[in-house]
Amino acid sequence: MIDLLKQELPAHYGLHRSVVEVPAECTDELRFDLADGHDTMIVAYGSGNVSFDRSCRTIVQVIGYEGYLNGWAGTGFERGRLRCDFIVYDAEKNGFFILNEQTSATGSIRNLQKPILDKKTGNVRFPGGKYEKVEAQLIETLRTLKAVPDIETFMEKFVRKVCLMSYILTCREEKDEVSEARCTFTVRYRQVEARETGEDGALLVCPGLNAEGFEYRRISHGYSFCPEG
């Protein structure tokens, strides 16, 4: 996949740069986390933004897709193109291929539904909030990749294909009674979400992803995703 991003994707989209960086790390750990914006993408289990708990020890390749796309800054291809954070796949047995987008909200899962405004115009861009934005990011990422014939062929060989929205709920840092109450409120909503999703995330309907042969799942941090299903 790394070579495909270095060679086939640029060729397909008519991109010309002598050096193309593809941020990548791998692990054979059964349990690990991914974190966006850290020095490393793969971090200790429970310490990142999404947790993986695997049933089979194989080499897992993680690609920082957002970082890769940012490397094309200044091109018409990159400008305005939605993207997810990570590509995660079983590099040995082709067991799974995952597109992961990470997000967060303060206090309550309800805040994930708040409309998102366009920073330039102030108009509502995503009426459905982060739920809608993440879905759009995953759909556009999938379409961008599958438009490249060799990448589509590479993706099709995997047994399980998943688009995964992962999120973390945070509390405000003020150490007062109001903040403590908000943190209690956050814990309660995590418990509600746990009942909704279980340990493998909620299975959602998304025609734009399902039509491409991908499951669409949503999971809260604190609960683990099993890539093998």
Indicate residue ranges for each PLM-predicted region:
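Short acidic, S/G/P-rich loop/turn micro-motifs used as interaction or catalytic elements
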Residues: 75-78, 94, 105-109, 173-178
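Catalytic centers of nucleases
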Residues: 80-89, 134
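Basic, amphipathic N-terminal segments that precede the first structured/catalytic domain
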Residues: 1-81
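Sequence/structural signature of beta-propeller domains
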Residues: 72, 108-120
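Short, solvent-exposed secondary-structure capping/transition elements
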Residues: 95-99, 108-112, 147-155
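Short, low-complexity, polybasic intrinsically disordered segments
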Residues: 166-229
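Catalytic cores of nucleic-acid endonucleases
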Residues: 118-170
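Conserved catalytic cores of phosphodiester-cleaving nucleases, focusing on short active-site segments
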Residues: 86-88, 96-107, 119
